[in-house]
């Protein structure tokens, strides 16, 4: 089964509400939808970045250019079922650009799984679970609005874990914001925070203990991504769990963080690692070091979220659950099928491959004009 064609499409999908982070406010998400054709079948994948190149080194524009000009010409004519060869070819030809590689890797997994009439989860080893506890992100920047949102989610039995974005205000203001949310949800929910690199080590060392006292269970990426030493010291000094996100940008960074036991948990993201196989390798590194895995998101659409669900469903342990909220943050979906959240958990889609199919009318509607 030879690869016959690889196509890319940039789509821009508005969010239902602005998401305020320490580094930007997100009003829309841009994705590159990849379709790989072989043997009469089409596999689909997705690449993207939160807020474009502000968060990382890639954007929808760079992802499309790398695939169209470097990766696609390299892979056309190759065996679509040989996933290892495809990864090796991409890594030799292109340095970095992990989201571009991930988009193709996901599409090839989807294609192979469809050809074998298997789900991706079954293709890569089988499921440990059919659903995963899912956290909702509170990022309106308004305390009353965030509390109302949390209480509505609890009442609807959609979410009882909440992640609050910090770093856009002063630490003192953030602390009061958190205290109000923790008090409002009481014992009905847990609260974790994401600083998105917004603090230096001194600020983090002062305010993380206060967040812990307020009832926070986990602090995500409190300091800049390159400061592994600060992460290690903060992990050693605090009882609350420290989660690496932006710092976890390659297999080598996973090894360094694990070797030094610099954090308590890894936020896994397929686009950060270059695809499915490398994400599984990072999870294995974490397991060997006694570090927890967490199901992270790049605010993926239904395509990327389905791919992540298949991967996370195979892992032995996810004590903090996941945050695969992208499809519900967006104002519309790009697939024919919805994903389901029920009883505080997101459920693995059924069917071969990803378990979702593109809605080509929606893709055309959101395609960026040339």
From Swiss-Prot:
One Pfam family named in its UniProt record: MR_MLE_C
Catalytic activity: 2-[(2R)-2-chloro-2,5-dihydro-5-oxofuryl]acetate = 3-chloro-cis,cis-muconate + H(+)
Pathway(s) this gene product operates in, as recorded in its UniProt entry: Aromatic compound metabolism; 3-chlorocatechol degradation
GO term, biological process aspect, one: amino acid catabolic process
Keywords, ordered alphabetically: Aromatic hydrocarbons catabolism, Isomerase, Manganese, Metal-binding
EC number: 5.5.1.7
Annotated positions binding Mn(2+): 194, 220, 245
Residues of the active site: 165, 323
Induction description: By 2,4-dichlorophenoxypropionic acid (2,4-DCPP).
Molecular function terms from GO: chloromuconate cycloisomerase activity; manganese ion binding; muconate cycloisomerase activity
Top-level enzyme category: isomerase
Requisite cofactors: Mn(2+)
Taxonomy, superkingdom: Bacteria
InterPro entries: Chloromuconate_cycloisomerase, Enolase-like_C_sf, Enolase-like_N, Enolase_C-like, Mandel_Rmase/mucon_lact_enz_CS, Mandelate_racemase_C, Mandelate_racemase_N_dom
UniProt miscellaneous comment: Different ratios of isoforms are detectable, depending on concentration of dichlorprop.
Family: Belongs to the mandelate racemase/muconate lactonizing enzyme family.
Protein name: Chloromuconate cycloisomerase
Species of the source: Delftia acidovorans
